[in-house]
Swiss-Prot record:
The keyword Signal applies. Its inhibitory activity is greatly enhanced in the presence of glycosaminoglycans, heparin, thrombomodulin and phospholipids vesicles. Glycans are attached at residues 35-36, 245, 258, 334. Its main location: secreted. One of its GO terms (molecular function) is phosphatidylcholine binding. Keywords: Fertilization, Glycoprotein, Heparin-binding, Lipid transport, Protease inhibitor, Secreted, Serine protease inhibitor, Signal, Transport. N-glycosylated; glycans consist of a mixture of sialylated bi- (including sialyl-Lewis X epitopes), tri- and tetra-antennary complex-type chains; affects the maximal heparin- and thrombomodulin-enhanced rates of thrombin inhibition. O-glycosylated; further modified with 2 sialic acid residues. Proteolytically cleaved at the N-terminus; inhibits slightly the heparin- and thrombomodulin-enhanced rates of thrombin inhibition. N- and O-glycosylated. Residues 1-19 form the signal peptide. SUPFAM superfamilies: Serpins. Heparin-dependent serine protease inhibitor acting in body fluids and secretions. Inactivates serine proteases by binding irreversibly to their serine activation site. Involved in the regulation of intravascular and extravascular proteolytic activities. Plays hemostatic roles in the blood plasma. Acts as a procoagulant and pro-inflammatory factor by inhibiting the anticoagulant activated protein C factor as well as the generation of activated protein C factor by the thrombin/thrombomodulin complex. This is Plasma serine protease inhibitor.
Length: 404
C-alpha cells in the first residue's frame, strides 16, 4: 500500500448558520483486545461503516475509525447535558461500558503511544484548534485539549475568510506532507472555531511485490461490469484464515514496523453478509486465529478516496444535537449559540507494490500459527474489504474496494 491520508474537520459556528455541502460524497503475543480507538467505540465504528455502505452501496468506502472517534471524544469535552449524552452513548460509553474519564485517559495514552518515533515507518498525527480571538473559550476545555489530546491552538481571524482558509489549509498541507491541500473550500465568516484531527502514515510492505509480476487482469465490479486493473502477484507466507461462518477469506499482508493490512474476500454474492458480521468479536477472531501459510496472492493496485459529511451520517447513529439549535457546547464557550455546522472526514489510499502512505497508529504484536500446507491461489478480482491494523490492537482504517 502506498498512500493513505485522513482528516477529520469540525467547524463550529452560530446555530443559525447554513450547512455547507462541500466535498460531499453520497454516501509476538496475542493481544488482550482489539481496539479501534478509546474503549467503548467499537460497535460505533462498525455501525458507522454500515451507515456509509447503506448510503452508497455500490461505492468505494474508506475512513479512519481512530480519527472519527478521537474527534467525537474531543467534542464531548465541551458538550453538556443531552448533547454530551448522545456523543458518549454513540461511542458506547454508558452503564457498564466504561466512563467518560476512562475514554479521555485512554485517548491520551493512545495518542502518546502512537507518537513514539519509529525507524521503519513514518507516523504523524495530532489535533489543532483554530479559534476566533474574541470568543471566550473555557480554560478547562483548552487545558484538557492540550493535555489529553495534545492539541495545538491558533488564534484565527474568521472575519477574513480567505485568510483563515489559507491559514488552516497551509497547516493541514504541512502536517500531511503536502498530500492534502485545499481541504477547506470556503469559509463565510460565521465560524468561531475549526477543529482539525489529522493522521499521516507511510510504511513499506515487509516483502515488496515484484513490479515485473504486475499485469492487467479483469476485476468484476459486478458479475456484469468488468474493468481491467493492474494486478499484483506474490508467492509468500501470509497470514490466512478461512472464515466459514461469514463465507470469506482473510489475508494479512505485513508492513515493516509491526503493522498489517488485512484483505477480506467474501464469497461471491456474500459481501452484505460479511458487512453485517463486522463486530468486535469478528475482528478478534480474524486477528487471533489466522494461520501463516504459503499463498499465491493476486491483489489489485488501487487508489480510492472517501470524503464524508458526517453531520449527515452521525444523526442516524443517535448523535444529533451537536448539529442543531439544540446543541449545548457551553463547555467550550459561554457563548450559548454555537453548534457544529460541518464535520468533514477525508481519507485517501493508494496501494502498489512497494508500500503505503496512510493515516495510522501503533500497538502490539500478533502471534500466528504456521501451517504446512501447499500453496493456495487467492485472487482479489471482485469487491473486497480492507482494514489496516497497527500492532494487532489498533484498527486504523476500514474500507471497501468496489472499483479499484
Amino acid at each position: 500500500m502506498r498512500l493513505c491520508l485522513f482528516l477529520c474537520l469540525v467547524l463550529l459556528g452560530p446555530r443559525m448558520a447554513t450547512l455547507r455541502r462541500s466535498q460531499k460524497k453520497k454516501i509476538q503475543e496475542v493481544p488482550p483486545a482489539v481496539t479501534t480507538a478509546p474503549p467503548g467505540s467499537r460497535d460505533f465504528v462498525f455501525d458507522l461503516y454500515r451507515a456509509l455502505a447503506a448510503a452508497a452501496p455500490a461505492q468505494n468506502i474508506f475512513f479512519s475509525p481512530l480519527s472519527i472517534t478521537v474527534s467525537l471524544a474531543m467534542l464531548s469535552l465541551g458538550a453538556q447535558s443531552n448533547t454530551k449524552a448522545q456523543i458518549l452513548e454513540g461511542l458506547g460509553i454508558g452503564p457498564g461500558e466504561g466512563s467518560e474519564e476512562e475514554l479521555h485517559s485512554a485517548s491520551q495514552r493512545l495518542l502518546r503511544e502512537l507518537q513514539q518515533p519509529q525507524d521503519s515507518l513514518q507516523l504523524s498525527l495530532g489535533n489543532a484548534l483554530f479559534t476566533k480571538p474574541r470568543l471566550p473559550i473555557q480554560e478547562a476545555f483548552l487545558g484538557a485539549m492540550r493535555t489529553l489530546y495534545l492539541a495545538d491552538t491558533f488564534p484565527t481571524n474568521f472575519e477574513d475568510p480567505e485568510g483563515a482558509k489559507k491559514k488552516i489549509n497551509d497547516y493541514v498541507a504541512k502536517q500531511t506532507k503536502g498530500k492534502i491541500v485545499d481541504l477547506i473550500k470556503s469559509l463565510d465568516g460565521t465560524q468561531v472555531m475549526v477543529m482539525v484531527n489529522y493522521i499521516f502514515f507511510k510504511a513499506k510492505w515487509e516483502t515488496s511485490f515484484n513490479l515485473k509480476s504486475t499485469h492487467e487482469q479483469d476485476f468484476y465490479v459486478t458479475p456484469e461490469t468488468v474493468v481491467r486493473v493492474p494486478m499484483m502477484k506474490q508467492q509468500d507466507q501470509f497470514y490466512y484464515l478461512l472464515d466459514r461462518n461469514l463465507s470469506c477469506k482473510v489475508v494479512g499482508v505485513p508492513y515493516q514496523g509491526n503493522a498489517t493490512a488485512f484483505f477480506i474476500l467474501p464469497r461471491e454474492g456474500e459481501m452484505e453478509q460479511v458487512e453485517n458480521g463486522l463486530k468486535e468479536k469478528t475482528l478478534k477472531k480474524w486477528l487471533r486465529m489466522p494461520m501463516k501459510r504459503r499463498l499465491e496472492l493476486y491483489l489489485p493496485k488501487f487508489s480510492i478516496e472517501g470524503s464524508y459529511q458526517l453531520e449527515e451520517v452521525l444523526p442516524k447513529l443517535g448523535i444529533r444535537d451537536i448539529f442543531t439549535s439544540d446543541a449545548d457546547l457551553t463547555g467550550i464557550s459561554n457563548h450559548s449559540s454555537i453548534r457544529v455546522s460541518e464535520m468533514v472526514h477525508k481519507a485517501v489510499v493508494e496501494v502498489d507494490e512497494s508500500g503505503t502512505q496512510a493515516a495510522a497508529a501503533t500497538g502490539m504484536v500478533i502471534t500466528f500459527k504456521s501451517a504446512r500446507l501447499g500453496s493456495q491461489r487467492i485472487v482479489f478480482n471482485r469487491p473486497f474489504l480492507v482494514l489496516i491494523v497497527k500492532n494487532s490492537k489498533h484498527i486504523l482504517f476500514l474500507g471497501k474496494v468496489t472499483r479499484p
